[in-house]
UniProtKB/Swiss-Prot annotation:
One of its GO terms (molecular function) is toxin activity. Exists in two forms, due to cis-trans isomerization at 2-Cys-hydroxyPro-3. The cis conformation is the major form. It comes from the Eukaryota. The modification 4-hydroxyproline is found at residue 3. This is Contryphan-Le. The modification Cysteine amide is found at residue 8.
């Protein structure tokens, strides 16, 4: 997951 987009 991305730090700024939890759904990545």
């Amino acid at each position: 997951g991305c730090p700024w987009e939890p759904w990545c």
